[in-house]
Amino acid sequence: LKKPEFIISTAMNFFMIAAWFSTYSYFADYLNRAKNMDNTTVSYMLFIFGIVGVVANFVAGKMMNKSVTKTTLFFLTGTIIVPLLLYYTTDMFFTTIIIVGLWGFMYSPSFLNASTYMISSAPEAMEFANSLATSFGNLGVSIGTTLGGIIIIKYGVEFTPWLTFIFGILAISMIGLRAILENKKHSN
């Protein structure tokens, strides 16, 4: 708990999960209002999202075997790319299908990536790190969803992707900060 790398990894976990849930928690509402989709179409979008997500978890598991940090960073780029695509594509139907597929792919392994990344910073206390990963992930869900709701009330659901973007930048910066600390330790 005293290792700076562990604390930074915990913050990354929180920011990553908060990023994804600030928009995903309002998935149906977002597609209804911002993309002008009816409820039946939204159901199909959820199906696409889920199917792609199953594939993404398999891919993420394979990638984790090669590099936990690179895998986490790869999937975190979705917190930057997906919000930009969602915001700037208005209600283009077929483009939205592709974006929802990408969203499902980048989002679905988020708990796997966040907890594995966090645990990798404390290999001597894996059980403890795992329990904190779950707790901070749940905190990220709560805070991301709450702030997403506040954005909806103040500005509208179409602006929730910007919250995802901001939390994503914070999560990526935590990975960079941890890398700097680890490089300093190895050079000393």
Show the residue positions of the predicted features.
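Extracytoplasmic gate region of multi-pass secondary transporters
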Residues: 5-47, 51
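Intracellular helix-loop hinge segments at the cytoplasmic ends of transmembrane helices
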Residues: 29, 111-121, 134
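Juxtamembrane helix-start elements in MFS-like secondary transporters
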Residues: 37-46, 92, 96, 126-130
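Residue-level signature of mid-helix packing/kink "hotspots" within the transmembrane helices
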Residues: 50-58, 141-142
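Helix-to-loop junctions at the C-terminal end of transmembrane segments
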Residues: 55-68, 152-153
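C-terminal transmembrane helical hairpin of 12-TM major facilitator-type secondary transporters
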Residues: 69-114
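A late C-terminal transmembrane helix in Major Facilitator Superfamily
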Residues: 120-159, 163-164
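Multi-pass alpha-helical transporter architecture, strongest
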Residues: 165-188
